[in-house]
Amino acid sequence: MAEQVYQLTREGYEKLKREREELKKRLMGEVAERIKEARELGDLSENSEYEEAKNEQGMIDSRIKEIDYILDNAEIIENGGNHDNSTVSLGKKVKIKDYRLNREQEFVLVTPQEANIEENKISIESPIGRSLLGRKKGEVINIKTARGSSKKIEIKEIS
C-alpha cells in the first residue's frame, strides 16, 4: 500500500518539527512527573490523577506518532512550488478583493495541516482555496462559501 504524501511548505514542516519536540519534552517532563507523583499516592485503581496523566500521556504520544508519520511522508514545497507568480498554487501569497465586504484580504494557500486563520493561512481544500487554485491575477470569481452563500472576489496579486 502506497504511503500518503503530505505536501508542506518549509515553514509548515519546521513548525511540525518544533511541535513534536515540545510534545516530547512535555511527555518526558511534566506528564512523567505527574504519573510518578500519582503512583506514589498508592492504589492506582481509584486514582483520578493517575488516570488523567495516563490519558494525557496517550494523547500526546498519539500526536507525536501522527506528526512523525506526516514528517516521514512529507514533500516540501519550496517557494510556492514554483517561481511563476502568474498562477495561484500551494504556498503562494494571494491578495484578493472581496466585493461583498468591499475590502482587500491577503493570505497564503497552505495544506490542511498548516491552515491557521489567525496567521492568514487558508487550506487549499477550503472552498476559497479550491476556487483559487490555478487562477490568474485579475480573474473575478464567484465562490460558494462553506455556509452556502456566494461571494465575488478578484485576484489582485500573487506572490
From Swiss-Prot:
Coiled coil: 2-41
InterPro entries recorded: GreA/GreB_C_sf, TF_GreA/GreB_CS, Tscrpt_elong_fac_GreA, Tscrpt_elong_fac_GreA/B, Tscrpt_elong_fac_GreA/B_C, Tscrpt_elong_fac_GreA/B_fam, Tscrpt_elong_fac_GreA/B_N, Tscrpt_elong_fac_GreA/B_N_sf
Superkingdom field: Bacteria
GO terms (BP aspect): DNA-templated transcription elongation; regulation of DNA-templated transcription elongation
Alphabetic keyword roster: Coiled coil, DNA-binding, Transcription, Transcription regulation
One Gene Ontology term of the molecular function aspect: RNA polymerase binding
Entries under SUPFAM superfamilies matching the protein: FKBP-like, GreA transcript cleavage protein, N-terminal domain
Any Pfam family: GreA_GreB
HAMAP family documented for this protein: GreA_GreB
Function summary: Necessary for efficient RNA polymerase transcription elongation past template-encoded arresting sites. The arresting sites in DNA have the property of trapping a certain fraction of elongating RNA polymerases that pass through, resulting in locked ternary complexes. Cleavage of the nascent transcript by cleavage factors such as GreA or GreB allows the resumption of elongation from the new 3'terminus. GreA releases sequences of 2 to 3 nucleotides.
Family: Belongs to the GreA/GreB family.
Protein name: Transcription elongation factor GreA
Species for this entry: Petrotoga mobilis (strain DSM 10674 / SJ95)
Organism taxonomic ancestry: Bacteria, Thermotogati, Thermotogota, Thermotogae, Petrotogales
Gene: greA
